[in-house]
Regions:
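Flexible, glycine-rich terminal cap/loop adjacent to redox cofactors
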Residues: 8-13, 20-29, 38, 240, ...
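A conserved FAD-binding loop/helix module that cradles the flavin
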Residues: 283-345, 433-451
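FAD-site-proximal beta/loop scaffold in flavoenzymes
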Residues: 123-147, 217-223, 230-315
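A Rossmann-like FAD-binding core segment of flavoenzymes
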Residues: 27-34, 71-95, 100-101, 169-266
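Glycine-rich dinucleotide-binding loop and its adjacent helix/turn
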Residues: 110-170, 206, 264-266
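Rossmann-like dinucleotide-binding cores of NAD(P)H-dependent redox enzymes
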Residues: 63, 150-151, 158-214, 300-305, ...
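Short hydrophobic core segments
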Residues: 101-111, 232-241, 310, 388
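Beta1-alpha1 glycine-rich phosphate/pyrophosphate-binding loop at the start
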Residues: 2-76, 165-188
Length: 454
């Protein structure tokens, strides 16, 4: 008999599991895969939407595969289909039509949904979030129609900043309001975040440490109240974070953790009553995992993390046996030409969890000083005091940030120290790098003694 696999969710996490199962199964294996997706499109790359809004390409290029691409492979790929409930005992998923879909293995990839701050006016026309293709289309339509003169973004995270750049590039007066004292506070320390603010504030007004109190207007948004001051706005983007979509899991009795995500074990299995369920897996935005530095529960709402988790889920369904391990969640983004990357803990997060640290910041160049078209690069490295192991990194430059963050992610996993960075052989060509790299200089500036053998 065929092994029935039902995947709930058709974002990056669900699609990754589907494709890995389809590619990884042995010819003798008989898998019957059903994917339930509430949206109407096949595979749409949400990560690319902010750049489409900036005019780099159309939203249409983000449609990677239509539903029939998967259906032609024998996959029961259902769009505009909602799961209503899960019966863990009888092993079936009830969908809106009343059909009961039996499963041998269930994959929860239900994603996340925008957090809407409790304030008046969030239902007015012209107020948007950015978490779906439809959201992107509505914003793009308003921008192309020339309907927006003043835009206000609530939230100073990746999506909010990238959207603000898109608005300002179209000549729109743009304000970003962030309740915390600096931008990207879960990823960067304040002095690093200030570099981004200084880079952008020629075109964007930042209201930091402020809270939007109300969105005002009759039918369409007209202004936003921040403290006692009223800011004109004919478009508002609420980008105040994403919350795991766990209603279905919670109603089924699956455990929801401290982070708000579905509790998982190392095999990405969901849990009930403190025990893992061998045939129910969870991954992506809705999954709670364990942080590799703090060892506390956390979320990692990144497509890149979801891909690794999907490999674990697919291998376990196929019987290979696989473990996810601890989560580092390396991130990188392009903010108006400035590449910003982060991995591990910030000094603030380390302080919150009582981790004693040393840190060093270096400003260098991406190439030899004499080489044309040189770019400045700023790196901050954070080490645990007693072991001098690397536990965090933040890098800002116009180039080479992603590859450096990937390198340091592996370094944290392997437990490298400041001395390891200082003593490691590195390649050199003046057109590509400096003899003494910015990471080496940052490790020395941390105060660790690289001359001491360990």
């Amino acid at each position: 008999m065929a092994k029935k696999v039902v995947i709930i969710g058709g974002g990056a996490a669900g699609i990754d599991v589907l494709e890995l199962l389809h590619r990884g199964k042995d010819e003798s294996e008989n898998l019957q895969i059903t994917l339930l997706k509430k949206e109407k499109e096949g595979f749409f790359s949400m990560c690319g939407v902010p750049y489409a809004l900036q005019g780099m390409y159309s939203l249409g290029v983000l449609d990677h595969f239509r539903p029939d691409f998967y259906q032609d492979k024998g996959i029961d790929f259902r769009t505009e289909t909602r799961a209503i409930s899960i019966n863990l005992k009888e092993k079936f998923v009830l969908i809106e039509s009343g059909e009961e879909l039996l499963y041998d293995c269930l994959v929860m990839a239900t994603g996340s949904k925008p957090f809407i701050p409790p304030m008046p006016g969030t239902d007015l026309k012209g107020v948007h979030t950015l978490s779906s293709r439809k959201d992107g289309e509505l914003i793009a339509s308003a921008l192309s129609a020339g309907e927006v003169n003043d835009a206000l973004v609530i939230g100073g995270g990746w999506i909010g900043l990238q959207a603000a750049v898109a608005f300002s590039k179209k000549g729109i007066k743009t304000v970003v309001v962030e309740r915390l004292p600096y931008l990207l506070s879960t990823l960067l320390d304040q002095e690093m975040a200030s570099i981004i603010k200084n880079y952008l504030e020629q075109d964007i007004v930042f209201m930091l440490g402020e809270t939007a109190e109300a969105i005002q207007g009759k039918d369409h948004v007209e202004s936003v109240l921040i403290g006692d001051e009223e800011f004109p706005a004919d478009m508002v983007l609420i980008s105040a974070g994403m919350r795991p979509d766990v209603d279905l899991a919670k109603n089924a009795g699956l455990e929801i953790g401290q982070s708000g995500g579905i509790v998982t074990d190392q095999a990405m299995r969901a849990q009930k009553g403190g025990l893992p369920l061998n045939n129910v897996f969870c991954l992506g935005d809705c999954a709670e995992v364990i942080d590799a530095v703090t060892f506390r529960p956390r979320l990692s709402q990144l497509a890149s993390t979801a891909l690794i988790q999907a490999r674990v889920v697919a291998e376990n369904i196929l019987g290979a046996g696989s473990s996810y391990g601890l989560c580092l969640s390396p991130t990188v983004a392009n903010i108006s030409g400035l590449q910003v990357g982060s991995v591990g803990v910030t000094t603030e997060i380390a302080k919150r969890y009582g981790i004693s640290i040393k840190s060093g910041t270096s400003v260098r160049f991406t190439k030899a000083r004499f080489f044309p078209d040189n770019k400045r690069i700023i790196a901050k490295l954070i080490f645990e005091t007693s072991s001098e192991k690397l536990i965090g990194a933040q890098i800002i430059s116009e180039e080479t940030v992603a590859e450096r963050i990937n390198e340091l992610t592996l370094g944290i996993k392997l437990g490298i120290t400041a001395r390891d960075i200082w003593m490691r052989e590195r390649c050199f060509d003046p057109s590509l790098t400096m003899v003494e790299d910015v990471l080496v200089d940052a490790s020395v500036r941390s105060g660790a003694d690289p001359s001491t053998k360990r």
